[in-house]
């Protein structure tokens, strides 16, 4: 199984994984609008791979099979301010 990963031009650290290059037919239109014009980041074989850098590989595979895409968003920003206890 392969996936094609695209970078969002509108949202920093946001990536869209699809099964085939330039095939966004299963991605909701509203998501594509907010994602912006996808920029190809890489083509990645998933078979034999045990993990991905910033996504759970099993969730990615399942999402690709069930809905045809996986959206990776950046982790939430933790507050840099500390409150005294």
Swiss-Prot record:
Coiled coil: none annotated. Residues 1-85 form the YcgL domain. Disulfide bonds: none annotated. InterPro entries: YcgL-like_sf, YcgL_dom. PANTHER family: PROTEIN YCGL. This is YcgL domain-containing protein ECA2367.
């Amino acid at each position: 199984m392969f996936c094609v990963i695209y970078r969002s031009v509108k949202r920093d650290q946001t990536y869209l994984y699809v099964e085939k290059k330039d095939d966004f037919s299963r991605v909701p239109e509203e998501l594509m609008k907010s994602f912006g014009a996808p920029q190809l980041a890489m083509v990645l074989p998933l078979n034999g791979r045990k993990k991905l850098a910033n996504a759970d590989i099993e969730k990615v595979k399942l999402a690709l099979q069930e809905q045809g895409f996986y959206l990776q968003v950046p982790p939430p920003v933790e507050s840099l301010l500390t409150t005294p206890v």
